[in-house]
């Protein structure tokens, strides 16, 4: 079966000023566990229909296609497999940072007309590990693993070669140049990214869907203007609204489509954001969040982590204005 072509639209600017309140009977523990919780999971309740109706969830999911995959050794120890995606809703290259060689993209592994085994290895559609002299993508002689395909060239998800067991950890992470690259103490984005990677590396499996939605969807330039407004006294929500943007302009339907492409229909979601649970599950619950794993700031549970008046104001606004599922630590 031929894969769908990706047609890139022209970008469209979104404006709005509406914020919403949504409370769930679910609070984070005082500490984020240092290991994956197994005895007392944070089970997300059913998201009410009116919440799904209120969120801008599309009737149909975007079309995504994984164009390349590569093994990345990391400075932290565990290897990752970086997947690059194209899609039909924007002109950006979004990423899936995957822990575990056996998490496989349907669109990456789909057989393509006139391709060779070398072509498949070059784009990352192989099993096992690459090594000098290897000639087959679909068979790894060192591990004796072989991929099988149906008559349409689609990968058969065999448990011996493809992850298909318990739901794995997932995080939907939006790009944050300031927090991840410029050492910003205005937000905890970089800290959450690192913590998600630590937990996934410890678990052996996981997926960070990395969406190119800088500044909660408003872009880096507008985000820098928002920072100036915050220095003038606005909080993170007020600053966006003053710039005629929504408090949160992101869409997570691309993440839903990417998770489905990777065969991750059930996940344990690392998040404090209740709206993200409904948004990632999608209007028709194509993905199911079976557990919420809280992301408690490091500074709230140790001497480490980000400490600044800016981060305290940022976290307070997330809790008080955006309904994030966190409890501030008691100050004695």
UniProtKB/Swiss-Prot annotation:
Belongs to the GTP cyclohydrolase II family. GTP binds at residues 171-175, 192, 214-216, 236, 271, 276. Residues 1-20, 25-46 are annotated as: Disordered. The active site is at 248 (proton acceptor), 250 (nucleophile). Its EC number is 3.5.4.25. InterPro entries: GTP_cyclohydro_II, RibA, RibA-like_sf. This is GTP cyclohydrolase-2. GO terms for molecular function: GTP binding; GTP cyclohydrolase II activity; metal ion binding. Its cofactor is Zn(2+). It catalyses: GTP + 4 H2O = 2,5-diamino-6-hydroxy-4-(5-phosphoribosylamino)-pyrimidine + formate + 2 phosphate + 3 H(+). Binds 1 zinc ion per subunit. The keyword Hydrolase applies. Residues 29-41 have a biased composition (Polar residues). Zn(2+) binds at residues 176, 187, 189. It holds the Pfam family GTP_cyclohydro2. Catalyzes the conversion of GTP to 2,5-diamino-6-ribosylamino-4(3H)-pyrimidinone 5'-phosphate (DARP), formate and pyrophosphate.
């Amino acid at each position: 079966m031929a894969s769908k072509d990706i047609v890139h639209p022209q970008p469209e600017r979104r404006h709005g000023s509406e914020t919403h309140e949504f409370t769930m009977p679910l609070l984070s523990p005082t500490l984020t566990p240092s290991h994956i919780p197994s005895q007392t999971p944070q089970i997300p309740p059913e998201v009410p229909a009116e919440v799904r109706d209120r969120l801008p969830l599309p009737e149909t999911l975007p079309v995504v296609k994984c164009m390349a995959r590569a093994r990345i050794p990391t400075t932290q120890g565990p290897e990752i497999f970086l997947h690059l995606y194209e899609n039909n809703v924007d002109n950006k290259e979004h990423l899936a940072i995957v822990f575990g060689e056996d998490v496989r993209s349907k669109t990456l592994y789909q057989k393509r007309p006139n391709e060779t085994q070398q072509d498949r290895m070059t784009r990352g559609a192989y099993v096992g590990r690459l090594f000098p002299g290897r000639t087959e993508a679909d068979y790894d002689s060192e591990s004796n693993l072989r991929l099988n395909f149906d008559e349409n060239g689609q990968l058969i998800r065999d448990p011996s070669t493809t992850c298909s067991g318990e739901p794995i950890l997932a995080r939907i992470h939006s790009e944050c140049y300031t927090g991840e690259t410029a050492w910003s103490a205005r937000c905890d984005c970089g800290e959450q990214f690192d913590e998600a990677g630590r937990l996934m590396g410890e678990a052996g499996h996981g997926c960070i869907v990395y969406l190119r939605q800088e500044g909660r969807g408003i872009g880096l330039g507008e985000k820098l203007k928002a920072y100036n407004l915050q220095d003038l006294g606005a909080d993170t929500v007020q600053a966006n609204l003053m710039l005629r943007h929504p408090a949160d302009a992101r869409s997570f339907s691309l993440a839903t489509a990417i998770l489905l492409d990777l065969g991750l229909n059930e996940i344990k979601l690392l998040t404090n954001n209740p709206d993200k649970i409904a948004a990632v599950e999608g209007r028709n619950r194509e993905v199911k969040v079976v557990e919420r794993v809280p992301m408690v700031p490091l500074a709230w549970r140790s001497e480490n982590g980000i400490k600044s008046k800016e981060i305290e104001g940022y976290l307070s606004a997330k809790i008080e204005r955006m309904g994030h599922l966190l409890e501030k630590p008691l100050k004695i």
